[in-house]
Each structure stands twice: as structure tokens, then as C-alpha cells.
Amino acid sequence: MSSKVSRDTLYEAVREVLHGNQRKRRKFLETVELQISLKNYDPQKDKRFSGTVRLKSTPRPKFSVCVLGDQQHCDEAKAVDIPHMDIEALKKLNKNKKLVKKLAKKYDAFLASESLIKQIPRILGPGLNKAGKFPSPLTHNENMVAKVDEVKSTIKFQMKRVLCLAVAVGHVKMTDDELVYNIHLAVNFLVSLLKKNWQNVRALYIKSTMGKPQRLY
């Protein structure tokens, strides 16, 4: 772990989040979020960063991925029960903004066959891109299930106009170790994106959806 957040602090915060949750059982699986507050950063002038990092354990088990596939990929997706759409189904949306928006809302992320990816903007318009869900490419050499898992366990840091951001790093059914490892990966990656690394970090918290925030830094 980087020297700025000690192992003990991290484990203590994780235990607080997980045990706080055990006291109040919710009817849904609470996500654990890493909340970051930045300083010495001017979103207007400084370069807005964005980057993705793959975590060891999938932070959101219910995260849904849809394959926009050629015939072979659609057949594969069907065989393993992964949601999919072929090019004909996409053409039927007829670039209708409402329908494309609905599609973007329905799934958390998309994969598209390499052969189709360049055609997506032409067939669907800019809707998926606007929603921040432009598909990742899927080749025929890749194992589809593994690729979907990779998408599910990848998180994105994106600096917008404000000096705080939040990302899902896990959920409350994880073990302490799984959650600590995910947070460790996420924090170190985030700090590496910042212009002045730790000097740009004002505070770090973790919290479950309904729980109290626990300060890490």
C-alpha cells in the first residue's frame, strides 16, 4: 500500500463499513464506493484525466453487459446466456434517440464485434457515446465470458467539472481482504493519474450505499 494510507487504517475502515452493514440488513446488495476529494486542481485549466483499472474482484455483481455482435458472436452469446443484439436489431432502432437512450439505460456496458464497431455510430447515432457507454471491441480470439468478466471488474475514473468523484470498488458481501485489495488498486491507480499525485488528494472516504463514510486519508 502506498505510504499515505496505512494498512491498519484501510482494514479498520473496511471492517467499519462491512460491520455497519451487518447491523442493518438491507433488501438489496449495497455497493461500497470510494469517494475522492481533490485539491490544487483547476478543472477549467488542468487536463481532465480519465483512466480505467481492472480490480481483482468484481465490484458490481449485477453489472449487465450486452454484446452487439456479428452472427458468430451472437451465437456464442446465446449459448452462454449473455444478452446480445445483432446488426438487424440495431438497425431497427432507426437512430431513434429515445430508443437508443433506452438501450443505453438498460445495460451498464457494451461489447461489440470488431467488424461492427466502426459501424455503430452510423447505425445508432451518438447515443451510446453520449451515455459514456461506447462499446469495447470483442475479437474472435477472445473468450467472451472472460471478456465480459473483465468489463464487469473494470472501473473508470473520470474527472468532470467538479473536484470530487466516486467509483464503485466492491460490495458488502465481499471479505475484508477482497475489499482492501480492490481499494488498494483503485487508490494507487487514481493517484498515478493526478498531476501532483498525493498533493492533489484532499480526502479519501469509503462508504456503503446506505452506510456512514469512513475516512482513509
UniProtKB/Swiss-Prot annotation:
There is a cross-link at residue 118 (Glycyl lysine isopeptide (Lys-Gly) (interchain with G-Cter in SUMO1)). Its main location: cytoplasm. GO terms for molecular function: RNA binding; structural constituent of ribosome. One of its GO terms (cellular component) is cytoplasm. Keywords: Acetylation, Cytoplasm, Isopeptide bond, Phosphoprotein, Ribonucleoprotein, Ribosomal protein, Ubl conjugation. There is a cross-link at residue 118 (Glycyl lysine isopeptide (Lys-Gly) (interchain with G-Cter in SUMO2)). PROSITE patterns: RIBOSOMAL_L1. InterPro entries: eL8/uL1-like, Ribosomal_uL1, Ribosomal_uL1-like, Ribosomal_uL1/biogenesis, Ribosomal_uL1_3-a/b-sand, Ribosomal_uL1_CS. One of its GO terms (biological process) is translation. The modification N-acetylserine is found at residue 2. The keyword Disulfide bond does not apply. It is found in: Cytoplasm. The keyword Transmembrane does not apply. The modification N6-acetyllysine is found at residues 91, 106, 118. The modification Phosphotyrosine is found at residue 11. It holds the Pfam family Ribosomal_L1. Component of the large ribosomal subunit. The ribosome is a large ribonucleoprotein complex responsible for the synthesis of proteins in the cell. Belongs to the universal ribosomal protein uL1 family. Component of the large ribosomal subunit. This is Large ribosomal subunit protein uL1. It comes from Macaca fascicularis.
